[in-house]
Amino acid sequence: MFRRLLFAALIAAGAVHAAELPEQVASLLQAAHIPPEGAGIVVLRGDTALISHNAQQSMQPASTMKLFTTLTALEQLGPAFRARTEFRTSADVVDGVLKGDLVLRGGADADLNEDVLLHMLQALRNQGIQKIRGDVILDRQLFQPARPDVGQPPFDEYPWAYYNVIPDALLINTNLLKVEMRSTGAKLALVMMPEMDKVGIRSEMKLTDAPCASWEKDWRTPDTSRHGDKIEVVLHGSFPKDCIKSTSIDVLDHHDYLERLLRATWRKLGGSISGQVREADAPVSAAPDAAPVPAPRLLAEHLSRPLPEVLRDINKFSDNTLARALFLSLGSLEADPVLGSRPLAADASLASTPMRAETAIRGWLQNHRIDGNGLVFDNGSGLSRIERATPAQLAGVLQAGLNSLWTPEFMSSLPIAATDGTMRKRLKDGPAALRARIKTGSLNGVIAIAGYVPDANNQLCVVVAILNDEHVANGAGRTVLDGVIDWVARSGGGAYSPGNPSSSK
């Protein structure tokens, strides 16, 4: 606690040449035509602020925002936290017939996919269920609103791309269809997976003589068309001749995706459904004099991987969809030592799950004496035009990570320079290679890094650098940030002296 308070005091006082950037970093900013006010940089070695440049400036953090979400989740939910998906019913099973509704309850399971659904449905068959004489109810009510994706405008010109998928509590396969395209000189063949009930695909793409390697250049946003109870995915644009490529697209409504996957999978197992597949908030038709329904019993369940494994996917690969789901989980779930997780009690004062999630993170920040002024949350992933954070706040989170019970789990979630994740191809020939653990972030006009860099004496430094400027594109911003990391990795055991990373006072 004393370290965090001392850090805040150092930043506020502008201690240790705080306003002055190292010559190496200042030169890189100048070469990239990025003005000093477009950069926010904090470097801490223990209790010493080596650099504090615009530390309190509220900036777009891009995906470094995920650090607020992931460290709060690790400390609030714990490393044993696992999300749940359940099949439940209140109906009896008689001669292979489930005489009532079957509920598929979503619990923000990061690993819910077609194979999990197959095994859960197989568990029903193993219990003797073949026919469902009722509805299958898709319960997404853990999050409020239950469908955060509905009514949201596209973030950019690629609404079908994975990074733009907006999760709900019952998202399966991240709502993606895998499409394989094989062309000859005259014909294009398409294969779409997974197999779904009454969902097909066709192409309106023209075959061209373009190189296969540049196939995405003339790809256009796919869409769907409905014909009665059938859905057709339609591809647009053009595609090279004599080319084989595959891609994943998000074009189906979340309800359609799960319903049609569930129907196809259940049919493969020899099952049938006499009723509808509907959402849990749809009206339930029941006789006025119907007897009280007993508490639903568990028929099948799936638990996600433990939280630290999910964090590695979020931070190493900057997975927006998983980060958004985890952010919402902070506002809807708590850890359970037996079940893995359970829903939080309702809070009438906080109407939406995002509000509860933000309250949870701000409470964690307050407990760690990290000032929340200027911090703006949207979805907790950084894929946002409105999320804001200061370099000092991110540095405070990283310091808290070093003092956490779960420091190893948190640090292991970060990309390793020149090794894996979003840092796999960066800093290969410098002293930070294999040693620095860095969360990256980028948007149009934004590039950022936040993490841990051992210096030349192997003393761990907290490093945050954010650039908000139109000139960060085409690698210019990345060069500056890599220069900051390199400067820290070459620095010695003393406080910073301008232009000399190895000097000590």
Regions found by a protein language model. Give the residues of each.
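Short, well-structured active-site flanking segments
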Residues: 75-90, 275-281, 407-411
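Active-site SXXK
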Residues: 47, 61-79, 136, 170, ...
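A small/polar active-site loop signature that marks catalytic segments
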Residues: 209-408
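Beta-lactamase-like hydrolase cores
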Residues: 18-46, 51-58, 118-127
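Short, Gly/Ser/Thr-enriched beta-strand-loop segments that form substrate-interacting elements
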Residues: 203-227, 253, 257, 297-301, ...
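Hydrophobic h-region of N-terminal signal peptides that target proteins for export
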Residues: 9-18
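Polar, glycine-rich mid-to-C-terminal structural blocks
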Residues: 106-215
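Small-residue-rich helix-loop
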Residues: 50-52, 113, 317-320, 327-505
